[in-house]
Amino acid sequence: MDWVLTSAPALAQEIPGIDELIVDLVDVDPGDAEWVRPGEARAAPASPDYDAVIEVAATARDLQRAAEMIEREFKTGSAVLSMYRTRPMPARIDRARRAGARSPGVKYIVLCRFHADMPQSAVQRSWAHHVSLALRVHVGADIYIRHWVEETLSPGAPPVEGVTELHFPTFEDMCSRWFIDDDGRRQIIQDIGHFLASGTRLYTSEHVLKAPDPA
């Protein structure tokens, strides 16, 4: 998967209008820290669903150019490529992302599929209502961002309707401070059950290749 990290900088070089470029390598084994809802299967760190996630923030025109370049440069051999256009909804950002190095800690990403019998407006309302609980319970996370999927760009890509990212500044924070306590964990499991049908869980290392200049 390292070839993704070495190849991705060409995106920013070819498309200077890209505001932010991040590569998340799915290379973290959560071990006993992994959490699942009752009845869910655990992830398989040795054979994850994806090897990497590439995040691009840019104008609509530059996003289209980036998608075309990713399709051309990264979809080789047996590689499976799934691209989505999302609308980010930051809830907590307590640390600035700095370009040029691996970010500390672990970035946990969930590709969300919501209950099929729920109208989109109801899902959005329930997910937005969940934010205050998540901020109170996930005390170890210094970044919490939700993404609403507005368009699937890859024909035949698996259905993904939302993306959640929680970033823990250290592995220990993920292990011991994911939830404020057992009751908080129970509340999270109960609340997401109202709108989340299933999710693909990815434990990643974040590499920021380009970031907006600090204010």
What are these regions (language model features)?
Residues 1-215:
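Macromolecular interaction modules
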